[in-house]
UniProtKB/Swiss-Prot annotation:
Catalyzed reaction equations: uridine(54) in tRNA + (6R)-5,10-methylene-5,6,7,8-tetrahydrofolate + NADH + H(+) = 5-methyluridine(54) in tRNA + (6S)-5,6,7,8-tetrahydrofolate + NAD(+); uridine(54) in tRNA + (6R)-5,10-methylene-5,6,7,8-tetrahydrofolate + NADPH + H(+) = 5-methyluridine(54) in tRNA + (6S)-5,6,7,8-tetrahydrofolate + NADP(+)
Protein name listed in UniProt: Methylenetetrahydrofolate--tRNA-(uracil-5-)-methyltransferase TrmFO
Cysteines paired by S-S bonds: none
Organism: Streptococcus pyogenes serotype M6 (strain ATCC BAA-946 / MGAS10394)
Keywords: Cytoplasm, FAD, Flavoprotein, Methyltransferase, NAD, NADP, Transferase, tRNA processing
Family assignment from sequence similarity: Belongs to the MnmG family. TrmFO subfamily.
C-alpha cells in the first residue's frame, strides 16, 4: 500500500493517547484532524466532554526513578509530553506518587489542543477506519460499537478483552475526621493520605460484608476476566481472607499517630488493616478510596463502605463502576512504532494496544504520534532503545507470545538488563537502569 498524499493526519479519539499523539504530530508542523465523539455521543463512564479525562483513579502512580513508571514519566517529560506537562501543572498532594486534579488537568489539556493552530477538533463519531490519510486510532477501551467492529475484524474476529473498574469518590466534609489520620506510607514525601484504621474485628466484619455483597451483573455470555492491576476489591477479597492485607489495605508503614485515641488491638503500634483515601481535586474537597475499584451495586457500595471507620456518614459523589476493555492482538498486528503491519498508514495507541495504565497509554500515543509524523515527512521510523522504558514497553506488547498476550504495565522486568555483574541491591540496580535509560534516551534524541 502506498503512503497517503493527504496534507494532514487523522487522530481518532482524544483520550490520553490520542491527545498526546495529536500534540506530538502538531508540534512537528503537521496539520491534525482530531476526532472526538464525546459531545455528540456519550460513553457509559465518561462524565465530561473534556479531552484526556481520567475515568478511573486520579493517580499517575509513583514518581521516583526507582519505580519504572516514574522513569517512564521522566522520559516523557524529556520528549515534551503534553500529558506530563499539564499533569505537573495540576498536581495534588499524594506523597511519593503523582496525582492530579482530574477536572483541572483535563480542562487544561483540552484548552491547549483546541487552541493549537494546527489542530482541527471535530466532534463526531467515526464508524469506519479512515483511508484518506495517515491515521492514529486511539479510541480507548470505550470504543464505540461501530468502530470496534472494524477493529475487531483486524483481530481476525478473536475477542481480546478484560474488565477494569473505578473506585468511589467521596465528599471530604462528610468524613469523620476524629477516626482517621493524615500520613503517607513510611512517611515518604508529604503527609498526603487520610488513613482509616481497622482492628482485626473491624476488618473481619468488613471482609464478610464485602464478600457477601451483591455485584452488578455482567453480560451472560462474557467471562469475568480482570486486569490484575485494576481488580475489583470484592474479587480480591474472595481470593482469601488476607489478600487485601497485602494489597490496598496493607497497614505496613502506616503506624498510628501518637495522639490516636480510637480503638486498636492491644498495644500494637500499627493497625490490623488500613483503608487509604487520596485527594482527588485541587480544592481538597473530594477524596477517592485508594485501590477500591468495584463492581458492586451502588446501594451495596454505600452499605459496605460506610462500615469503614470514619466513613459511616460519607456521601458518595461518584460510585465505583466497571467497564469492558477490548485490546488488540498487538504481537501479530503491530510493529514497535504501533504501526499496523498490514496497513502502514494506520497506527494505534492507548489501552487497545495492550498497554495498561494512564501513563503507559499516553506513552504509546507519544510513540505513535512521533512516528506518524515521521512517516508523513518520509523520515525513518524512530524506535526508542530497549534500555529505556518508552522503548521497552512497545517492544514488549508487539513481541509477546500472542497465545498468552495480556495487557502490561511498564516495569523493570521488560527493560533490557544491565551489562556486567548483577547489582544485588534492588534500589541500586533500579537506579542504574534509570541512569542508563535517561542517558540512552538523551543520546537517541541528540542524534535526530
Amino acid at each position: 500500500m502506498s503512503q497517503s498524499t493527504a496534507t494532514y493526519i487523522n487522530v481518532i479519539g482524544a483520550g490520553l493517547a490520542g491527545s498526546e499523539a495529536a500534540y506530538q504530530i502538531a508540534k512537528r508542523g503537521i496539520p491534525v484532524k482530531l476526532y472526538e465523539m464525546r459531545g455528540v455521543k456519550a460513553t457509559p463512564q465518561h462524565k465530561t466532554t473534556n479531552f484526556a479525562e481520567l475515568v478511573c483513579s486520579n493517580s499517575f502512580r509513583g514518581d521516583s526513578l526507582t519505580n519504572a513508571v516514574g522513569l517512564l514519566k521522566e522520559e516523557m517529560r524529556r520528549l515534551d509530553s503534553i500529558i506530563m506537562r499539564n499533569g505537573e501543572a495540576n498536581r495534588v498532594p499524594a506523597g511519593g506518587a503523582m496525582a492530579v486534579d482530574r477536572e483541572g488537568y483535563a480542562e487544561s489539556v483540552t484548552a491547549e489542543l483546541e487552541n493549537h493552530p494546527l489542530i482541527e477538533v471535530i466532534r463526531d463519531e467515526i464508524t469506519e477506519i479512515p483511508d484518506d490519510a495517515i491515521t492514529v486510532i486511539a479510541t480507548g477501551p470505550l470504543t464505540s460499537d461501530a468502530l470496534a467492529e472494524k477493529i475487531h475484524a483486524l483481530n481476525g474476529g478473536d475477542g481480546f478483552y478484560f474488565y477494569d473498574a473505578a473506585a468511589p469518590i467521596i465528599d471530604k466534609s462528610t468524613i469523620d475526621m476524629s477516626k482517621v489520620y493524615l500520613k503517607s506510607r513510611y512517611d515518604k514525601g508529604e503527609a498526603a493520605y487520610l488513613n482509616c484504621p481497622m482492628t482485626k474485628e473491624e476488618f473481619m466484619a468488613f471482609h464478610e460484608a464485602l464478600t457477601t455483597a451483591e455485584e452488578a451483573p455482567l453480560n451472560a455470555f462474557e467471562k469475568e476476566k480482570y486486569f490484575e492491576g485494576c481488580m475489583p476489591i470484592e474479587v480480591m477479597a474472595k481470593r482469601g481472607i488476607k489478600t487485601m492485607l497485602y494489597g490496598p489495605m496493607k497497614p505496613v508503614g502506616l503506624e498510628y499517630p501518637d495522639d490516636y485515641t480510637g480503638p486498636r488491638d492491644g498495644e500494637f503500634k500499627t493497625p490490623y488493616a488500613v483503608v487509604q483515601l487520596r485527594q482527588d481535586n485541587a480544592a481538597g474537597s473530594l477524596y477517592n478510596i485508594v485501590g477500591f475499584q468495584t463492581h458492586l451495586k451502588w446501594g451495596e457500595q454505600k452499605r459496605v463502605f460506610q462500615t469503614i471507620p470514619g466513613l459511616e456518614n460519607a456521601e458518595f459523589v461518584r460510585y465505583g463502576v466497571m467497564h469492558r476493555n477490548s485490546y488488540m492482538d498487538s504481537p501479530n498486528l503491530l510493529t514497535e512504532t504501533f504501526q499496523s503491519r498490514s496497513n502502514p498508514n494506520l497506527f494505534f495507541a492507548g489501552q487497545m494496544t495492550g498497554v495498561e495504565g494512564y501513563v503507559e497509554s499516553a506513552a504509546s500515543g507519544l510513540v505513535a504520534g512521533i512516528n506518524a509524523a515521521r512517516l508523513f515527512k518520509r523520515e525513518e521510523a524512530l524506535i526508542f532503545p530497549q534500555t529505556t522504558a518508552i522503548g521497552s514497553l512497545p517492544h514488549y506488547v508487539t513481541h509477546a507470545d500472542s497465545k498468552h498476550f495480556q495487557p502490561m504495565n511498564v516495569n523493570f522486568g521488560i527493560i533490557k538488563e544491565l551489562e556486567g555483574p548483577r547489582i544485588r541491591d534492588k534500589k541500586e540496580r533500579y537506579e542504574a537502569i534509570a541512569s542508563r535509560a535517561l542517558a540512552d534516551l538523551d543520546t537517541c534524541l541528540a542524534s535526530l
